[in-house]
Amino acid sequence: MAAITAAMVGELRAKTDAPMMECKKALTEADGDMARAEEILRVKLGSKAGKAASRVTAEGIVATAINGSTGALLEVNCETDFVSKNDDFLAFVNDCVKLVAEKNPADVAALLALPLNGQTVDEVRSALIGKIGENIMPRRFKRFTGSNKLVSYLHGTRIGVMVEFEGDDTAAKDVAMHIAAMKPVALSMADVPAESIAIERSVAVQKAAESGKPPEIVEKMVEGSIQKYLKEVSLLNQTFVKNDKQTVEQMLKAANTTIKGFTMYVVGEGIEKRQDDFAAEVAAQVAAASKATA
């Protein structure tokens, strides 16, 4: 009997995207023969899982879970909006976000290795891929714990917000809704990332220079643009979405509430969606059919 090493299991998993335990079982059954192990997995899991797992996932949902002072925010991706409404997919996501809150996995790989319904999360995921025919993958998550109170808000299933706060629950919930609507990038002006300010300054300098005004006026125009930008993207300085006569900071002060931090996930942000060329796809299928009959 050939010795089955971790490297062999990793290689087979990379080729097939099958769960690690299934890869180990297949290699054991094949006595270490990689090609034979791949064949065993194709028979056992079908071709769906391996093919689907290589496709781009830019749709999906965001889910939240709160249990006392512990909470979790999770994004799980799939390929189409249709599957994001599938009951089995929704149940899988719900199970995963609860695991994040309860088990505190270090990263997505650790989440996939956690036990779920007698299997690992990755094994359940692979079976779901085979059943639905689309790639499914937890993309990112954040776990919250500590002395702060938590409130979450979901705008449909595509935008999820978790807010850490002290004070009034209703005011904090309103802020969570505001964040989903106005999408601030930082809590205060001082928290806006330096690289974001640098990019905005570069744009402002170029626009101001085109005005043809004296350098001292151009400098004031640039600083004015930067201050306007900082107010627009910092939560506390934004105009409150439910009352345009006050800022979020003013609303919170009146409610004796303090926001300690927030996190917002938007499904698919930063993922380049696959653009299908239907004509090219048909041509490829015709060419493949011609080769098969030649």
Curated annotation (Swiss-Prot):
GO terms for cellular component: cytoplasm. The keyword Nuclease does not apply. Residues 80-83 are annotated as: Involved in Mg(2+) ion dislocation from EF-Tu. Pfam families: EF_TS. PROSITE patterns: EF_TS_2. InterPro entries: EF-Ts_dimer_sf, Transl_elong_EFTs/EF1B, Transl_elong_EFTs/EF1B_dimer, Transl_elong_Ts_CS, UBA-like_sf. GO terms for molecular function: translation elongation factor activity. It is found in: Cytoplasm. Keywords: Cytoplasm, Elongation factor, Protein biosynthesis. Its main location: cytoplasm. Disulfide bonds: none annotated. The keyword Transferase does not apply. Signal peptide: none annotated. Belongs to the EF-Ts family. Associates with the EF-Tu.GDP complex and induces the exchange of GDP to GTP. It remains bound to the aminoacyl-tRNA.EF-Tu.GTP complex up to the GTP hydrolysis stage on the ribosome. This is Elongation factor Ts. The gene is tsf.
